[in-house]
Amino acid sequence: MKETDQMQSLEGSGAERSVGTQTGSMTGQIPRLSKVNLFTLLSLWMELFPGVEAQGQKSQKTEEESRGPLGDNEELTRVSTEKKQVKKTGLVVVKNMKIIGLHCSSEDLHTGQIALIKHGSRLKNCDLYFSRKPCSACLKMIVNAGVNRISYWPSDPEISLLTEASSSEDAKLDAKAAERLKSNSRAHVCVLLQPLVCYMVQFVEETSYKCDFIQKTAKALPGADTDFYSECKQERIKEYEMLFLVSNEERHKQILMTIGLESLCEDPYFSNLRQNMKDLILLLATVASSVPNLKHFGFYCSSPEQINEIHNQSLPQEVARHCMVQARLLAYRTEDHKTGVGAVIWAEAKSRSCDGTGAMYFIGCGYNAFPVGSEYADFPHMDDKHKDREIRKFRYIIHAEQNALTFRCQDIKPEERSMIFVTKCPCDECVPLIKGAGIKQIYAGDVDVGKKKADISYMKFGELEGVRKFTWQLNPSEAYSLDPNEPERRENGVLRRRSAKDEQRSSKRPRLETRSAGRATLQ
């Protein structure tokens, strides 16, 4: 039972370490994600970072063309088999319980190798959260860097044990090598999964259903209601369960035993483990569905005269949506009883890097919380409904954007395109900070734009100049196509208008949904 005891003791130590870091011990009226579960969910979500598949197809096509019409079929088959066996993996790098890196595998490098290249000796004393158990090649370098802890999702590892590949024996040998590295390492290599607090899933479902993105979508699409959210969520649940869970219990036990988790194969540990994993996948699918992947909706500039100019500088919608879901996950660490807000800052370098995120790299993230080191009762928690202004929270709480800027792990470079993703419209307190920090783009909801409330106002966002603003709305260049006389069809669970030309072509091609000015996503 060594592994089980280690998992439980490390969970306890993780909870203790979070005390005093942005009020980690806070307990209040709303359920809250633990930091361990937040980092785990972000690692799973980073495995789904868009764009890598398209890069892989392009790379493979170039390779085939370079070999000529006949090509080396045997070599191509071998390379293809190896790529299928190596699973894309997400990684969250944490130092002093603060995120300093979000990564995913690329076409050429595993995510552990990318972490070594990006962080080097700075990995010392860091905690690493992988979406799959890393292979021995990654593990030996990470351990050598002096990391403190390596946590991984207890399912199919990076070198897959599920694929029917000819080199499955190599996968088992790699798993044994990784286990030996773990046994002889000073770093803790373990599974950190904590049960979700009571009512957490229900709370996430309710708040995701009511979030600005879903409600605005439902109001804007003719004939649609919020039932599309439930349908979209069910699709995501099926997709993520296939990707992150092992449906067959006996097969799951075999994998756990192969990767050194024999003690988790006995009940009640095994059943508890599977239930915790299912709960986290349900939560991830729920949050991901709150920023739906739609044809006509996305993050666009509202100014008609700037649409064509800005298009060439905006992110693909899939990437913008992915980053906003990161912010939505962060919002569930909030200390605000009324409204959870998350923010994440990314930048885009001049050229592509070795990371699976391409030219984009992580700057910082945050959520709204009270000052670091404070305890639950140190500051007022009342909102503007309370008559006594002295005991209202607004003078004490640190906004998500402010925390993201304060705890950023890299400088914001003026010559690069930097962007912040916020789950709500930035308030008048944060807008000048964002502009002053040199951030070039803001992606946010706009439900509160122009509103002035008792303790907080949102007047400056609409008037902001010098920073590009992309808000969740109908694509201005496609809005005209929503003719109420057109036939309807469901796409990703959402009612969408369909032209006769679309009907004719639908049987001849995959469901390729075009974005504005040539951007496209395969749904």
Swiss-Prot record:
It catalyses: 2'-deoxycytidine + H2O + H(+) = 2'-deoxyuridine + NH4(+); cytidine + H2O + H(+) = uridine + NH4(+). PANTHER family: CYTIDINE AND DCMP DEAMINASE DOMAIN-CONTAINING PROTEIN 1, DEOXYCYTIDYLATE DEAMINASE-RELATED. The gene is Cdadc1. Its EC number is 3.5.4.5. GO terms for molecular function: cytidine deaminase activity; zinc ion binding. One of its GO terms (cellular component) is cytoplasm. A motif (Nuclear export signal) lies at residues 272-284. It comes from Mus musculus. This is Cytidine and dCMP deaminase domain-containing protein 1.
